[in-house]
A protein has these predicted regions:
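A short linear-motif detector with a strong N-terminal bias
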Residues: 12-15, 28-31, 41-44, 69-71, ...
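Walker A/P-loop-proximal flanking segment of P-loop NTPase domains
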Residues: 36-43, 50-53
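An aromatic-glycine-centered, glycine-rich loop/turn in mixed alpha/beta architecture
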Residues: 1-39
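Switch/coupling segment of Walker-type NTPase motor domains
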Residues: 47-135
Length: 135
């Protein structure tokens, strides 16, 4: 089927989502980071589900790669914001300092005292954290 023919209705079938995919409404939102929507189309009926990654699965080798501008930082921001909203702890390593500035806006006032920012380049407030202290 040629894609350049005018006045043709094309239906593209995608594979259905896996049966154990964590979806909104079927999974505990505090245990899933929702990150997108499926694009499953069956005949003329669209079935789109909001899906995510289970927190226990995120503990194992989650690797986000892509070229500039494809949304790697936005995906991380989405997951971190959900973790903060559900009261989970977060550790962010930000070599440029821009990501943490965006995230600080989403920390509730009652939790702001729990935030610890370690900036090795800050000469006014040097860090007393020594990762090699007990090595």
């Amino acid at each position: 089927m040629a894609l350049n023919k005018p006045n043709k209705i094309q239906i593209i079938k995608y594979a259905p989502p896996p049966p154990d995919l964590p979806t909104l409404g079927q999974s505990d939102p505090s245990e899933v980071s929702f990150i997108g929507r499926t694009n499953y189309v069956a005949s003329l009926e669209e079935k789109k589900f909001v899906f995510g990654i289970k927190r226990v699965d995120r503990r194992r080798h989650l690797y986000i790669i892509g070229k500039s501008g494809v949304g790697k930082s936005k995906l991380q921001e989405l997951m971190v914001r959900q973790d903060i909203a559900y009261g989970h702890g977060v550790c962010i390593i930000d070599p440029h300092g821009e990501f943490i500035d965006d995230i600080l806006e989403f920390i509730p006032e009652e939790r702001i005292e729990d935030v610890c920012i370690i900036d090795p380049g800050d000469i006014d407030f040097p860090s007393s954290f020594n990762p090699l202290a007990n090595v």
